[in-house]
Amino acid sequence: MLSYSTGRRKCAVAQLRFFSGNGKIVVNGCSLDYYFQHNSAFTKIIRSPLKLLNLELLYDFIIVVKGGGLSGQAGAIRLAIARVLAGLSPSNRSSLKSKRYLTRDSRIKERKKYGLKKARKAPQFSKR
């Protein structure tokens, strides 16, 4: 194992182990395509830091991801991969930072307030 990293997005937390290998990505014991239901949008999000640095076929990743939905999990995995690749060399870090792959997206679900139907949706107002 070369390195370890963690990424978070919405309610999802991804823990990543990083090995030298041939580009295999395993998520929760399944292949990347199978876990994300062959959805190319999610796999594109996850592979984008690797594609940017042309490192797609050099490293293997074993990822355990919990919480959230598929979109949040894909974002968490992308952040974890970007953090691990940024630690390899300073030039990687600058190119990943320019594309904002190292920025933690802090937007989370707003809590529901009492007296309201949802976080901001109020019941219909009647004057009379």
Swiss-Prot record:
Region of interest: Disordered: 106-128
GO terms under biological process: translation
Keywords: Chloroplast, Plastid, Ribonucleoprotein, Ribosomal protein
Subcellular location: Plastid, Chloroplast
Subcellular location, principal: plastid
PROSITE patterns: RIBOSOMAL_S9
Superkingdom per UniProt: Eukaryota
Residue ranges with Basic residues bias: 109-128
NCBIfam families listed in its UniProt record: PRK00132.1
Family statement drawn from the similarity comment of this UniProt entry: Belongs to the universal ribosomal protein uS9 family.
Protein name as catalogued: Small ribosomal subunit protein uS9c
Organism: Cyanidium caldarium (Red alga)
Gene encoding the protein: rps9
